[in-house]
UniProtKB/Swiss-Prot annotation:
This is 6-phospho-beta-galactosidase. It catalyses: a 6-phospho-beta-D-galactoside + H2O = D-galactose 6-phosphate + an alcohol. D-galactose 6-phosphate binds at Q19, H116, N159, E160, N297, S428, W429, K435, Y437. Its EC number is 3.2.1.85. GO terms for cellular component: cytosol. The active site is at E160 (proton donor), E375 (nucleophile). The keyword Translocase does not apply. One of its GO terms (molecular function) is beta-glucosidase activity. Pathway: Carbohydrate metabolism; lactose degradation; D-galactose 6-phosphate and beta-D-glucose from lactose 6-phosphate: step 1/1. Belongs to the glycosyl hydrolase 1 family. GO terms for biological process: lactose catabolic process via tagatose-6-phosphate. Keywords: Glycosidase, Hydrolase. It comes from Streptococcus pyogenes serotype M2 (strain MGAS10270).
Length: 468
């Protein structure tokens, strides 16, 4: 049976400042930790990325032409405050005013994120969000933006608090490149959630117009053998690390007993302790019912198996299928079911996982108000022929995820939109330029844009709300 989506559903495309803009030192922009980290550790940099800093009018014109009526944009904190605090950079402020004006001119609603992996270097090198002073700096930056950019109707505090802690302190593929420090992972999650809560409360108390929420990456975690209690436990612990700890902070304003039992077990095995203060919980509690929406970023699921051994994680950054490894002491290891498709980067493609995650939010956090799927898409080594890409695999992937969103809406969940990652090809944090996600192909040499087959398909779905 053909499935449909509501008439007012947003069909969006997603971007991020550092992955799209380029111009990393232009017009007074301050450095971010990624600048040097990429130079030192990877075979690519964020220059020129998709040159969105100069070419946003082209991308927004294409958006309008192809039925994309929403865009996720992030503000580069170091374009506004080059050192994260103190002096404002007027050219950065002007750039974002111009960008938002162009969005509205093209009838593409901007959903604006304050922090998308790019803490200014001056603050990042001083502990990033492990340093509680950074909470104050973030809240001050947020307040400046709320006041300055009154044309924005949808604000997001953070993009993917989970993968930041994971990338910086567990896998070590994000600066500062620390591995296997679970206490830092949870502390980073916690301090960022306090920052989120403080900013949301400030937004509501300040009477600013518009809506505010947060974007969480929520990869669904399943036991490899659902009949084995040890595998079930491994999936629960892995879910606490990546999802439940952060969701509890967002919607409960505290960590449930079950969550803390899991956290304490993980830290007992791996070492370290957390600094959780009473005023933190007061801040979390004050904001728990104020979130206007939850953004869910979903690409894949994981299956967990009980495991007794030392932690070892190998990140597959080059798309060499089967080269990744993930096992955490006292938690478990990822083991892929044979019958579920995987990408070259070992991502397990399972649309049902998105449905299950959406239903989990509704069941466990009934004070959620609405959901946007703020990222979902398929990374490919695209083959550019005839000035396009015949990306049927991407179409199939997005179609199946839109279908489960339709199912979730039918089953009573308030899902209001979908943002495909990514609007145009951008650079990927830990995979460079080979892994493409866009609706529009970018020739990174010339910066020309070419609509892919998926763009024409997406346009039809956006115009008809019929998924076929």
């Amino acid at each position: 049976m053909t499935k449909t989506l509501p008439k007012d559903f947003i069909f969006g495309g997603a971007t991020a400042a550092y992955q799209a803009e380029g111009a990393t030192h232009t017009d007074g922009k301050g450095p971010v930790a990624w600048d040097k980290y990429l130079e030192d550790n990877y075979w690519y940099t964020a220059e020129p990325a998709s040159d969105f800093y100069n070419r946003y009018p082209v991308d927004l014109k294409l958006s309008e032409e192809f039925g994309v009526n929403g865009i996720r944009i992030s503000i580069a904190w170091s374009r506004i405050f080059p050192t994260g605090k103190g002096e404002v950079n007027p050219k950065g402020v002007e750039y974002y005013h111009n960008l938002f004006a162009e969005c509205h001119k093209r009838h593409v609603e901007p959903f604006v994120t304050l922090h998308h992996f790019d803490t200014p270097e001056a603050l990042h090198s001083d502990g990033d969000f492990l340093n509680r002073e950074n909470i104050e700096h973030f809240v001050n930056y947020a307040e400046f933006c709320f006041k300055e950019f009154s044309e924005v109707n949808y604000w997001t505090t953070f993009n993917e608090i989970g993968p930041i802690g994971d990338g910086q302190y567990l896998v070590g593929k994000f600066p500062p490149g620390i591995q296997y420090d679970l206490a830092k992972v949870f502390q980073s999650h916690h301090n960022m959630m306090v920052s989120h809560a403080r900013a949301v409360k400030l937004f509501k108390d300040g009477g600013y117009s518009g809506e505010i929420g947060v974007v969480h990456a929520l990869p669904t975690k399943y036991p490899f053998d659902a009949n084995n209690p040890d595998d079930v436990r491994a999936a629960e612990l892995e879910d606490i690390i990546h999802n439940k700890f952060i969701l509890d902070a967002t919607y409960l304003g505290k960590y449930s007993d079950k969550t803390m039992e899991g956290v304490n077990h993980i830290l007992e095995v791996n070492g370290g302790e957390l600094d959780l203060c009473e005023e933190d919980f007061a801040a979390l509690d004050a904001a728990k019912d104020l979130n206007d929406f939850l953004g869910i970023n979903y690409y894949m699921s994981d299956w967990m198996q009980a495991f007794d051994g030392e932690t070892e994680i190998i990140h597959n950054g080059k798309g060499e299928k089967g080269s990744s490894k993930y096992q955490i002491k006292g938690v478990g290891r990822r083991k892929a079911p044979v019958d579920v498709p995987k990408t070259d980067w070992d991502w397990i493609l399972f649309p049902q996982g998105l449905y299950d995650q959406i239903m989990r939010v509704k069941a466990d956090y009934p004070n959620y108000k609405k959901i946007y799927i703020t990222e979902n898409g398929l990374g490919y080594k695209d083959e550019f022929v005839d000035n396009t890409v015949y990306d049927d695999g991407r179409i199939d992937y997005v179609k199946k995820h839109l279908e489960v969103i339709s199912d979730a809406i039918s089953d009573g969940v308030n899902v209001k939109g979908y943002f495909m990652w990514s609007l145009m090809d951008v650079f990927s944090w830990s995979n460079g330029y080979e892994k493409r996600y866009g609706l529009f192909y970018v020739d990174f040499e010339t910066q020309e844009r070419y609509p892919k087959k998926s763009a024409y398909w997406y346009k039809k779905v956006a115009e008809t709300q019929v998924i076929e």
